[in-house]
A protein has these predicted regions:
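ABC ATPase nucleotide-binding domain helical subdomain, centered on the C-loop/LSGGQ "ABC signature"
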Residues: 1-29, 73-74, 82, 120
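Helix N-cap at the start of a conserved alpha-helix in ABC-type nucleotide-binding domains
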Residues: 66-67
Length: 131
């Protein structure tokens, strides 16, 4: 089903399967019974379930540990192979998902281009702060 697929992409499957009530569990107001990472996974699953042509994610892994984030990146790459995904993040570990990177500083674009070009410019110090 679409719900199971969305849960798989978001990384919720194991958590849901361990819970005695499964998908019928109560999670409380604003997900208060969930960890920060689980709340992010629920939000991601809800977005995936809508199947939008463009998926906008703001700091989608900020509450995830390294292992959880790594598994999420693998699942997202497979799910979003033919979609436009915009990720707003401070985590450089998500750069590998990008075809294009836009770097902003103080509300201004200071770099924009293919991932390899922007990463090279950043590493060589060719990208400065906004003036």
């Amino acid at each position: 089903s679409a719900i199971v697929h969305a849960a798989e992409v978001a990384g919720l499957t194991q958590f849901v399967n361990r819970h005695p009530q499964g998908f019928d569990m109560l999670i409380g107001e604003r997900g208060e019974s969930l960890s920060g990472g689980q709340r992010q996974e629920v939000a991601i699953a809800r977005a995936v379930l809508m199947d939008p042509p463009i998926l906008l994610m703001d700091e989608p892994t900020s509450a995830m540990d390294f292992s959880t984030e790594h598994q999420f990146k693998l699942r997202l790459r497979q799910h979003a192979a033919h979609k436009t995904v915009v990720i707003v993040t401070h985590r450089t570990s998500l750069i590998e998902l990008a075809d294009r990177i836009i770097v902003m500083d103080d509300g201004r674009i200071v770099a924009d281009g293919p991932r390899e070009s922007v990463v090279e410019a950043l590493q060589s110090g060719k990208v400065g702060r906004a003036q």
